């Protein structure tokens, strides 16, 4: 295993504990990424690389779609938001062969 991708910071906290138990150094021996960037990402050592979602934008779009559906003007819509990767110290550097 070269990396662990966690869907929440709370799961990442468990992964950090497991890596520690196995004497694996995050950011050197193994990479760890989380899919939210709340509080824990900043408190770990090394800080966790994370995929951050535009939560406010997603919420606004959801409300707009619901209001359109309620007024019966809206059709089924798809909305795609672009996440941002916030690089921190938890990703190991790749070795060139």
Residue ranges and their predicted role:
Residues 1-96:
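Flexible loop/turn connectors
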């Amino acid at each position: 295993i070269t990396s662990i991708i966690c869907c929440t910071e709370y799961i990442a906290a468990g992964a950090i504990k497991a890596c520690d138990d196995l004497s694996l150094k995050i950011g050197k021996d193994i990479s760890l990424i989380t899919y939210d960037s709340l509080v824990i990402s900043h408190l770990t050592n090394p800080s966790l690389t994370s995929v951050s979602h535009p939560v406010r934008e997603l919420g606004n779009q959801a409300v707009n779609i619901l209001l359109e559906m309620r007024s019966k003007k809206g059709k089924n819509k798809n909305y795609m938001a672009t996440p941002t990767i916030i690089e921190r110290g938890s990703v190991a550097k790749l070795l060139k062969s």
